[in-house]
Amino acid sequence: MNYQIELRHLYYFKVLAEELHFRKAADRLFISQPGLSRQIKQMEGIYKTVLFDRSKRSVHLTEAGKYLMQEVELLFSQLNNIQTQIEKIAEGKVTSLRLGFIGSAVQTILPQLLASLKHKQPLIDITLNELSNETQLEMLSRNELDFGFVRIDTAPPNIKSLPILTEHFALVIPKNHPLKSKRNLELTDFKDEPFILFSKAYSISYYDLVMSIFRDQDFIPNVTLRTVNALSIFNLVSQGLGVAIVPSSLKNGYNTDVDFIELEHIHQRTTLTLAWNHENRNPGIPALLEVINQLL
């Protein structure tokens, strides 16, 4: 008998690949363990390859299984997107967009973009999530986000990008810092201070860029605290726990007890970038791109 791959096969495979345990996967699927085994063997027969390495103690994906899992995750993500878009259309809404962003996007273009987009398409449904750069890129690759506002040097092959804003850096110090009254402050004036920085989890390339600033100033910073949140950095600085370097735009929109010293003389610049997956067929993507190109 000739079998063909059906959606249920792929869903059974996905659950087993997540659990890597036949009994647990069968329980999630509300089927018997032998029934699940038959479905997986049927898939392996259709694909003419082994998808799982099985032993008495463990279950692991083969290389073919790992590849299939990547594709299956994208497939089910797209199916979820289709369902969401159909539901929005049924509600009378044009479409929905899922936007990821880092904090500095809120202080620059994001509010204006949302206002313009809502003006053009009042019924569009928008979900916002503040996320790290790395998380946004991962979610864009899986079609779990439609757009991301990130700070990156390079993007994966399936991700397109559009530079939005290039800016210099600023030094953040407590309002009561003893050097505050000194004229013509330089970064090297703070070389003995503890530094609070965005961590590598925020963006590896951004972290490396900031560290290059210190190298150019001929000192290694004493980095005592790292975080992925701008407000956390400002609160820590205001408590006298250190000083920080951030994109200059972050001086706007936060009510914090800190001062900003512009580092315009430093050649390093950081760019806020709009990123999206060129394989994503969400009908709202062209609408947002049209609006943002009008704003730039």
Model-based region annotation:
Residues 2-5, 89, 112-116, 127-129, ...:
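Short beta-strand-centered segments that line the small-molecule binding cleft or hinge
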Residues 109, 259-296:
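A late-sequence structural motif
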Residues 13, 25-26, 62, 117:
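Hydrophobic two-helix hairpin corresponding to the core of helix-turn-helix DNA-binding domains
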Residues 91, 161-195, 283-286:
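Flexible hinge/capping segments at coil-to-helix
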Residues 44-61:
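A short LG(V/I)-centered, amphipathic sequence patch enriched
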Residues 33-34, 81-138, 201, 247, ...:
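N-terminal winged-helix
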Residues 195-217, 282-285, 289:
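Secondary-structure junction motif
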Residues 14-32:
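Short helix-boundary/capping micro-motifs
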